[in-house]
């Protein structure tokens, strides 16, 4: 004789999906080992979970209604949709079913071990109706606020911010970064934890500006009483040996002598794509002077087919000493003001 899942949950065969949920909620709370210390509680808790797993699934329930437990587990119920025979085996962890039903956390942990108001202990708790009413909890597992109508929501932990350093070459071409994070995850029992590593993939788009944020929602540590934090990476430019960044423009500083600043010179200016641009400077280089090469900067974030400019600044090197004769020559040929 197979198991009577309807009898286990205390419902009849015509029960609706909502009836199944209510029955499981009631029986699971009644026989949960953290509350019920009787020797039979663990086995009853497991039976209730298995009954719910079957009756809450339309496919399993249909096969069970026609062929019973033996037919469900023995493959008498047709195919699995891929040409194979459908067979059901209970996974054996009623705590996983309980945690999934109540949203991944154990609602008992905040009140088990206490005596209830009015002198009742947990063994005498009333299960019919709303089983959470004695604890200030609503049917969906959220804490009740006596001064409000709706359930109060769990709060999310503050975001966890990480600085992500990228080179100008990576911003110029775009790249993929893979960041390994470690976080705590709740086990199916909703109480204990495990450590888990995860690789987060970040697609760095061409031209992204410093300060750009990449958010991975709810990838932080899991806790029973809060929503996991978002993991946020913030783009930070690495220091470059040749260039500085000015928005989508690239700034290159050319070092020249005083004679070159006054008499002119020829330069080879490096670019982000590895080339050198020949540049002839014929004007007198004055303080703060810049030369602009259009279209040789970084891609625009919103239109990566277009680029900013390459800006050339000049760092004029003055001599430490100069002879008296040279001073006299300069005095004769340079204007006084």
Curated annotation (Swiss-Prot):
Q: Which organism is it from?
A: Mus musculus (Mouse)
Name the Pfam families for this protein.
DnaJ, DnaJ_C
The gene that this protein is the product of is Dnajb4
Residues bearing Phosphoserine?
122, 148
Question: Which protein, by its recorded name, is this?
Answer: DnaJ homolog subfamily B member 4
Q: What is its biological role?
A: Probable chaperone. Stimulates ATP hydrolysis and the folding of unfolded proteins mediated by HSPA1A/B (in vitro).
Molecular function (GO) terms for this protein are: ATPase activator activity; protein-folding chaperone binding; unfolded protein binding
- A single GO cellular-component term on record: nucleoplasm
Q: Which residues form the J domain?
A: 4-68
